[in-house]
Amino acid sequence: MITVANLTKSYGGQVLYQNGSFFIGPGEKVGLVGPNGAGKTSLFRLIMGEERADSGSIDYAKSLRICYFSQNVGELKGRSALEEVVHGNPRLGFLKTEISKIEKALEDGDYSDELLEKLGDYQTEFEKLGGYDIEYQAAEVLTGLGIMPEAHHRPVESFSGGWKMRIALAKVLAQKPEFILMDEPTNYLDVESIVWLEDWLRSFKGAVFMTSHDRDFMNGLVKKVVEVNHKTITVYSGNYDFYEKEREIRRDQLIASSERQQAMLQKEEEFIAKFAARASHAAQVQSRVKKLDKIERIEVMPEDMAINFEFPKPPRSGNDVVKMDSVGKVYATEEGKQKRVFAGVSGVVKRLERVAVVGVNGAGKSTLLKVIAGLTEATEGKAEIGANVQVGYFSQYSMDVLNPQKTVFEEVRDRVKDKSDGYMRNLLAAFLFRGDDVEKKVSVLSGGEKSRLILATILTNPCNLLILDEPTNHLDIRSREVLVEALKSFEGTILIVSHDRHFLKQLTTQVAEVNKGGVTFYPGSYSEYLSLAGGH
């Protein structure tokens, strides 16, 4: 279907990949992985013809229908959500217009063979592209991605950025192309929408090539992984978990080969040094010098090693960390109406519990966390923090407090008091800020880097109740693993909202489900909750 052969691409003096090759066949689901800046998005753009390679080729049939979902959705306006999705394929619009024109000509008595043949061709193509059921498909996909039927006819301008991303994703899916490129499709989706998308893609007969920070999503779909890293493209025949294990095995084998080669080279060099001045060995020395010149050195690229950082032990809180008694919350809408978020919420969160707060988008998860954190008042009832409880709170808005003019190190120094420079550098290293990274200005950091910076400072301050609202947003898989390990070692209580199932499965001891204006508590892990709920 798509053959990439000997691909080389560079920007300025930086080589992204050299002589990289891989193949994606019909119906294959393939993951694309690699560190930030390795060239994942560039590879998508090369396939789409939006960028040119330095050398090599990307070959596929001209008739192949390809769609590309990227994080840059452009400006959406002038249509309803449903109309935007229906108009995702301009060719369908053209065909519909031409068919209408021909049908009008037929009504006027023009029955020429040429016109009838053209009508037949247009109708065949229109049907092949799904034109006759596109509205049904568009509505089904929008609903699956969490935009309910009552919102289908709302103007796209009325949706927030995250919901516009869903509309843009729906535009791609509803076209049912033969090949889909997807750059982080699970961003901004809740768990229910991610599960729906995973099921949809699993039954999709076309090929998919995608990046995703959601490990469970990748594991559930892909059977092949393409890695871009260290200027090379490497293919692994398995899901994400297989890729991680196989990558480690291959690296160990490479290190062993490199060590054997180094031992051999050292012996040869010792021989050359020992006999270089002896005329009787001149031929042998010359032969071995030539041999060494021809040997291609095995290069083992440096890997970021995990940093063992011991977070400070928080002060002990009382056993009852959070108490809620008939808590309710009502908001005033822009139209001046009252909107109830939840009511009658009662419960106690005990010390050392790790509670996942779950529910569909708009159910009130973030509002519940804000009420508990004291950032907004309950309209009814009472939410109380227990004795000796100190709160650390994180949300996507926490990043707004960062000073864009300061460096990463300066931000940490200002927020982590009475600690040495070495301590702060180790802290930053544990959150993947290493070497020159600590001197980066906050203004140039990505969303994921800003999240890591804030989380690092929260975890090293003496709080014993962490309230985390979507801490995994913008974090890649490696950063999420770093955060999981940090939270596992945290000797306090955690309330957390996240749409990453793998992340929640590793952490939680209790689940609070916000649904239909109430909250239900389920003892046990997130995996046990999913089993009860019939989830994935």
Question: Each predicted region: which residue ranges?
Answer:
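ABC ATP-binding cassette signature C-motif
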Residues: 1-258, 305, 314-536
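Intracellular alpha-helical coupling/juxtamembrane segments of multi-pass membrane proteins
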Residues: 246-302
